[in-house]
Amino acid sequence: MASNPASKTSKRNVVKSGAVKSRAAQKVGSASVRANRNPVEISILVPVMNEAGNIRPLIDEICSAFANRQFEIIYIDDASNDATANELTAALDTVPQLRVLRHTQRAGQSAAIRSGLLQANGDLIGVLDGDGQNVPADFPALESLVIAASKDGKMVMAAGIRQRRDDSAMRLLASRGAKWVRASLLADTHPDSGCGIKILPRTLFLQLPFFNHMHRFMPSLVRRHGGVVLGVPVAHRPRIAGTSKYRILDRLLVGISDVLGVIWLLRRAPTQGAVHEVLATPPANKKTKPKEAAQ
């Protein structure tokens, strides 16, 4: 059977991030062992790059949102050069649900999410921006929708819709422009594709094509695979530390090529219904052929 080159590349990147010889890297292994000993209902992936000051408050909020649950938090440090690594290392000593992966070189937010996804143990995957602007207390509302839909056999991603966004006027304007482009060219009807908080089944997430900046187009990609996207109103708040990593002009220029690539993907989506395996009739249900009478 042919292997998936993209999957191989992602796995190599994870090995590199785990090969960092530091106290934090050693604890990644022990945390992974703990996570594998107990069933994990949901894995929360938090990609970060230079988010010192936001680390511990957000971890504590995630733990509160999933109190008395089997969960894991996977932080993916995308080669931060501030105190992010130190803050994550300190948190490992007191938060047993925490795991930390570290990229040896900067790879971007989508690559960080992918690294966490490949290491996650939960059947459900939650994604959360590491800047603290999304509120972890909104996770249960998203999770309940996904669980209810899965009982009906549907593949669903529950995605946040930010209420009263606490961003600059320029960033809000850029966001509205991006929303118009996605709606016009990708038929993306989700009101807030850029919102960082979402939950979906791990099996569905793994089916989505991986490329740089794919996290911005997840509603379109989920629908491409026959999934349903449900929007949930969520809170939004200002940062308590650090600055945004995105520049509006850079985002616009990169976004144009991304949209063209996603259009290419959507037009080539395979058309196929459900697949069912045909099983042999059990021996007990087979009709025995009558014996011929003796001559």
Residue ranges with predicted function:
Residues 2-38, 188, 211-295:
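Hydrophobic helical membrane-anchoring modules
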Residues 41-43, 72:
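Cell-envelope/extracellular polymer assembly enzymes that use nucleotide-activated donors
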Residues 53-57, 82-91:
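Acidic helix N-cap motif at the loop->helix transition within catalytic regions
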Residues 61-70:
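Short, acidic, metal-binding catalytic loop of nucleotide-sugar glycosyltransferases
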Residues 70-80, 101-102:
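Short beta-strand/loop segment that forms part of the nucleotide-sugar
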Residues 77-86, 132:
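A conserved acidic beta->alpha catalytic loop
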Residues 97, 101-119, 124, 133-215, ...:
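Acceptor/aglycone-binding surface of glycosyltransferases and processive sugar-polymer synthases
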